[in-house]
Amino acid sequence: MSGRMAVLLLMTCSVSRSDHSPLPKDPFADCLATDRARLKALARDAKSQPGPKRAKAQADFDALLERSRGIVAKRRERLPKPQFQEDLPVNGRRGEIAELIAKHQVVIVCGETGSGKTTQLPKICIELGRGATGYIGHTQPRRLAARSVASRVAQELQTQVGMGVGVKIRFHDKTIPESVIKLMTDGILLAETQTDPYLNAYDTIIIDEAHERSLNIDFLLGYLKQLLPKRPDLKVVVTSATIDAERFSQHFNGAPVIEVSGRLYPVEVRHRPVQTDDKDDERDLYEAIV
């Protein structure tokens, strides 16, 4: 699509329509999310400005559109090809999870400990083509968890922390513009709303362990609910224990919930017999316990 055609399509998007008529495709869907606001502003200028100003706005629009699409095309080509461990319970429902993420803006994933949701969900998002127009943001409640998850996901994607998988915690940022996944604490993402109120750096956000309900998580969930109508291209995945699934679904206006069982291992209990150093069978209670 040429720059002038994109301007014309943007102009038609502003025309009022009935609630049942289909919405046109976003003319900037293949551009970086961080560039879309600027592109829309330039498109308006190219329509309304007179004479030389209009020509300059059109030239700036065309240049930015070409640059942004080029970056997205390169990011899409460089997306990792994830491999999935079929023994993880979450991968048994990978197709269902991917379908829900593709169809809905918000998805609630309930998974018990050991289900693999923390490491596999960002890979499922990559498989869907997410991460091309912005980072796949992935929050953890604690700094240690963010670093360990980043290391594990990078290992599974055969890349390095600080390259394909970035991590950002307090006083420590190993993220580059070419990173696809960005691990961080929920406090870091909340702080970024001050400088990036529309979270344009991201095309997908995963809020992990949301059932912990810290202040940061609660603020983020409230903020995202207000943001989603303004960012229809943004996908949000919330993971939680089963106890809070319906509450999260109601918060996001009936978002679909999918449950994933945990992975259990057999536990064998053995009792070590009391052993004595001599043949004296009489021992006091304290020695027997110790």
Give the role of each language-model region.
Residues M11-V290:
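P-loop NTPase motor module signature
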